[in-house]
Curated annotation (Swiss-Prot):
It comes from Sodalis glossinidius (strain morsitans). L-aspartate binds at E171, R217, H448, R489. Residues 195-198 are annotated as: Aspartate. This is Aspartate--tRNA ligase. It catalyses: tRNA(Asp) + L-aspartate + ATP = L-aspartyl-tRNA(Asp) + AMP + diphosphate. Keywords: Aminoacyl-tRNA synthetase, ATP-binding, Cytoplasm, Ligase, Nucleotide-binding, Protein biosynthesis.
Length: 596
């Protein structure tokens, strides 16, 4: 039906007869001629209908936007005065000789000027995907997947599929459960990742594995998260963490060069502790020049207790954030930033404007200056590198509150004041994460997952001091987004059982949930390490959008709903009975109300 795509026509096709298939993007009548912009997945081309071609011209009079059609025509060069430089095909046009209307279209429920809410776009996603920007994003996604496969194949990795119906294991989020009809009362879980299966593949002797795979997590959603998402999943045997990072960095560097033409260069490394101390985040955006600066030692003895109390507390922190040019901020704006910091637990912000640096304390403006004294103020100005027209924000509280609040403020100010350089890429590796973190209930949780190996300690040493252990883990960060994360895995049974014990997983629960893994660790398990990239997030970055739903063909909302198909839906009564499932409580009420 088609010999070439609309968007691929150029001057090399002049004089050729072509067959095109697509949609009417726009129709217009000009001086007895009918013109349409015809669209397919590759782009637009102008088609015109001459009254001398009576059959085609008569049919063209019936055309309306979004009619689906096939036509035959002759490619012609446009006169120089009519070349459209804003269209990729703007140097040519097609004189239609035959026209077939395949299907008509009702007026679209979406605004052609793109003044549509996201809910409208998701409700009529099949129409939203006709937009060139959406088509381009999905084409880029396909290019990325294809490039990854070629790279991994060339590096000797095997593409091996792992099960979608598996066993529920604690990996940090809630599982999506699938009831078994055959095994009454039992449930499969959709995998949060192929983590354990890829480790088992290493134990099976497949030393280089990869997979582009769907994963599922029942968690609260954000703009860059979905309940079902796609990972580029990788695992290796007999490779160190450094070697894994080298291969994966090369993959991303080559991918960026392929898609954007940009060379990312060698990725710097930063420890987790440095990232949190300097940037208030374990995924720092290095395009933003601002850094957090500790000043607790300078304010331990001041009369201002808001500063001195946390400065003398081992669990406290007093830090400053210098904002270049920030002295322009009004008092109202400063107060708004103080309220913003309260979202992250801070009790507000102290501030100091630097109007004339050379004048020392006389050149600053601050409601807390009188409590600090000239010597402390000068020390703060020196340490922060303050200059004329800067403002310095201060936060004093528990370490995590100060770090979170100033880290978030740094990002917001960077964008608000245009300090973040948005037209560059800033990749890095963050390494040496804590092995464990507090779970909020007096216990410990794995910072990554419970299969991550610690660095430089054996099982006995780990059990003796778990909170000081450093994980042999690493995250790749680009422009403030964690695009991938991985670790060296535990390959000894005693270490794995020790980690389970630290996480308060008793021996019975270990056997119930991980018995197959503990058994496998008895049979000559090789050292292994891996990583997983979020494909959706990579595509989001490479296509310049900030919403992951823009790069998934049929995404869910932030409420994990599909507005087009109206999923999830209530279960059929007979199907529920076959599965031995009874809906109770609020679910029962919702089901009855939904069907009434």
């Amino acid at each position: 039906m088609r010999t070439v795509y609309c968007g691929q026509l150029n001057l090399s096709h002049v004089g050729q007869e072509v067959m095109l298939c697509g949609w009417v993007n726009r129709r217009r009548d000009l001086g007895g001629l009918i013109f349409i912009d015809m669209r397919d997945r590759e782009g637009l081309v102008q088609v015109f209908f001459d009254p001398d071609r009576q059959d085609a011209f008569a049919r063209a009079a019936e055309l309306r936007n979004e009619f689906c059609l096939q036509l035959t025509g002759i490619v012609r060069a446009r006169p120089d005065s009519q070349v459209n430089s804003e269209m990729a095909t703007g140097a040519v046009e097609v004189l239609a000789t035959e026209l077939s209307i395949i299907n008509c279209s009702e007026p679209l429920p979406l605004d052609s000027n793109q003044n549509n809410t996201e809910e409208q776009r998701l409700k009529f996603r099949y129409l939203d995907l006709r937009r060139p920007v959406m088509a381009q994003r999905l084409k880029t996604r396909a290019r990325i997947s294809s490039f990854v496969r070629r790279f991994m194949d060339a590096e000797g990795f095997l593409d091996i599929e792992t099960p979608m119906l598996t066993k529920a294991t604690p990996e940090g989020a809630r599982d999506y459960l699938v009831p078994s009809r055959v095994h009454k009362g039992k449930f499969y879980a959709l995998p949060q990742s192929p983590q354990l299966f890829k480790q088992l593949l290493m134990m099976s002797g497949f030393d280089r594995y990869y997979q582009i795979v769907k994963c599922f997590r029942d968690e609260d959603l954000r703009a860059d998260r979905q309940p079902e998402f796609t990972q580029i999943d990788v695992e290796t045997s007999f490779m160190t963490a450094t070697q894994v990072r080298e291969v994966m960095e090369r993959l991303i560097r080559d991918l960026w060069r392929e898609i954007t033409g940009v060379d990312l260069g060698i990725f710097p490394q930063m420890t987790y502790a440095d990232a949190m101390r300097r940037f208030g985040s374990d995924k720092p955006d290095l395009r933003n020049p601002m850094e957090l600066v500790d000043v607790a030692d300078l304010v331990k003895d001041v009369q201002f207790k808001v500063f001195s109390i946390p400065a003398n507390d081992s669990q406290g922190r007093v830090a400053a954030l210098r904002v270049p040019g920030g002295a322009q901020l009004s008092r109202k704006q400063i107060d708004e930033y103080g309220k913003y910091s309260e979202i992250y637990g801070a009790k507000g912000l102290a501030w100091m404007k630097v109007n004339q640096r050379a004048a020392g304390v006389e050149g600053v403006q601050s409601p807390v200056a009188k409590f600090l004294g000239p010597q402390v103020i000068e020390q703060i100005l020196v340490r922060t590198g303050a200059a004329d027209s800067d403002i310095i924000f201060f936060s004093a509280d528990r370490k995590n509150v100060v770090t979170d609040a100033l880290g978030a403020l740094r990002l917001k100010l960077g964008l608000d004041l245009q300090l973040t350089v948005t037209d560059r890429w800033a990749p890095l590796w963050v390494v040496d994460f804590p092995m464990f973190e507090e779970d909020g209930e007096g216990g410990l949780a794995a910072m990554h997952h419970p299969f991550t190996a610690p660095k430089d300690v054996d099982a006995q040493m780990l059990a003796a001091s778990p909170t000081s252990a450093v994980a042999n883990a690493y995250d790749m960060v680009i422009n403030g987004y964690e695009v991938g994360g991985g670790s060296v895995r535990i390959h000894r049974g005693d270490m794995q059982q020790t980690v389970f014990g630290i996480l308060a997983i008793n021996e019975q629960e270990q056997q119930e949930k991980f018995g197959f893994l503990l058994d496998a660790l008895k049979y000559g398990t090789p050292p292994h390490a891996g990583l997983a990239f979020g494909l959706d997030r990579l595509v989001m970055l490479l296509t310049g959008t900030d919403n992951i739903r823009d790069v998934i063909a049929f995404p869910k909302t932030t409420a994990a709903a599909d507005l087009m198909t109206e999923a999830p839906s209530f279960g059929n009564a007979d199907a529920l009975a076959d599965l031995s499932i009874a809906v109770v409580g609020k679910g029962r009420e919702a089901m009855e109300n939904g069907r009434s």
